[in-house]
């Protein structure tokens, strides 16, 4: 009996130690409000080192004005690169217009990339407009457009992007069917990989409970596939995950860049890193720390190189922390309130203004 008691105590102690190593809370940062919009729902954020702060607005509803803006103070905004590029309407080509921009991103060379899935209201791609766009730093005009028309079905939705400046490759998530898109930026060749692989599909058994209830759509559990994506500072590893479960995966980018690998060989190179949080976006800093959200817990966490997870901030204002950008020693965070959209609340729109961008010191 005594031995059994000691064993039980040791088991509880070890469990506590493991839990602590899983999430070490070393004190919280404070959120600093950088931008707010009282009318239009934003998703993406991109901060230029010592420069501009941009946000984007997907065309998810009829309450819509511009796709991409440069912010001016906490409420001001200017359409980017101009009003005309932001003025698309049904029936027009989407190749040189912003149709439904999902993400904006500065690579480490300071080049701005704009990702447009071109699927208004998350429906079908319009005007052959699904594209990744590289902007010219000097003229703020479109330098090159990579159209996804050759490889995407009309029902696809490209979600997020990371660019390897040295190797000239881009990696993107596709969140409808699940998968990764690999783009050779030099010659424009692209391909879809890991399509409907277990690492790009949300775990059907995971209950995505947020605000005290499982998120539902059309009477069924809401499932979001491959979404967040992050590239290690050396460009050797791509980290990614489905949104609506807590698993995290990675794969060596050399395998993604090798078109000679069979689908089966490539899938065998995926590494399952374990359980962490449900997050939308994620991003590495230059030291190799990975920052993610916790949609269910209203917090931002950091994973170090040993995958030790630390809470940086927990705050009720973090209503669906969506996208991330790092500049000037800060982590910038957009909050999009997706769980409060009417399709997840029996047709009732529970979103409240403002939609926000915060930052925390890192």
Regions found by a protein language model. Give the residues of each.
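Beta-strand-rich domains and repeat architectures in extracellular enzymes and scaffolds
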Residues: 34-66
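Short loop/turn segments immediately following beta-strands, especially the blade-tip
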Residues: 185-189, 251-262, 362
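Beta-propeller fold detector
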Residues: 76-86, 143-147, 191-206, 258-271, ...
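C-terminal motif of bacterial Sec signal peptides marking the signal peptidase cleavage site
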Residues: 16-19
């Amino acid at each position: 009996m005594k031995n059994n008691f000691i064993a039980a105590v040791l088991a509880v102690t070890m469990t506590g130690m493991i839990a602590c190593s899983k999430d070490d809370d070393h004190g919280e940062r404070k959120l600093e409000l950088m931008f707010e919009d009282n009318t239009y729902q934003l998703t993406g954020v991109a901060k230029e080192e010592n420069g501009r702060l941009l946000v984007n607005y997907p065309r998810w509803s009829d309450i819509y004005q511009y796709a991409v803006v440069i912010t001016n103070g906490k409420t001001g905004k200017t359409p980017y690169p101009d009003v005309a590029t932001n003025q698309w309407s049904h029936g027009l080509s989407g190749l040189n217009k912003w149709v439904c921009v999902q993400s904006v991103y500065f690579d480490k060379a300071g080049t701005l990339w704009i990702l447009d899935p071109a699927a208004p209201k998350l429906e079908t791609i319009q005007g052959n407009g699904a594209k990744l766009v590289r902007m010219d730093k000097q003229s703020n005009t479109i330098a090159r457009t990579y159209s996804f028309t050759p490889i995407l079905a009309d029902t696809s939705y490209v979600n997020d992007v990371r660019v390897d400046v040295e190797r000239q490759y881009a990696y993107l998530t596709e969140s409808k069917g699940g998968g990764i898109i690999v783009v050779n930026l030099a010659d424009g060749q692209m391909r879809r990989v890991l399509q409907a692989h277990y690492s790009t599909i949300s775990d059907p058994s995971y209950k995505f409970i947020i605000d005290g209830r499982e998120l539902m759509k059309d009477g069924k559990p809401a499932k979001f596939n491959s979404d967040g994506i992050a590239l290690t500072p050396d460009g050797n590893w791509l980290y990614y995950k489905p949104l609506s479960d807590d698993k995290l995966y990675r794969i060596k980018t050399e395998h993604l860049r090798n078109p000679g690998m069979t689908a089966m060989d490539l899938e065998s190179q995926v590494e399952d890193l374990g359980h962490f949080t449900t997050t939308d976006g994620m991003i590495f800093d230059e030291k190799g720390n990975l920052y993610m959200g916790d949609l269910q817990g209203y917090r931002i966490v950091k994973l170090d190189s040993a995958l030790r997870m630390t809470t940086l901030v927990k705050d009720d204002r973090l209503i669906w922390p969506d996208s991330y950008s790092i500049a000037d020693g800060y982590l910038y965070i957009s909050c999009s309130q997706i769980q409060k959209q009417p399709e997840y609340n029996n047709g009732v729109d529970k979103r409240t203004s403002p939609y926000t961008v915060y930052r925390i010191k890192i």
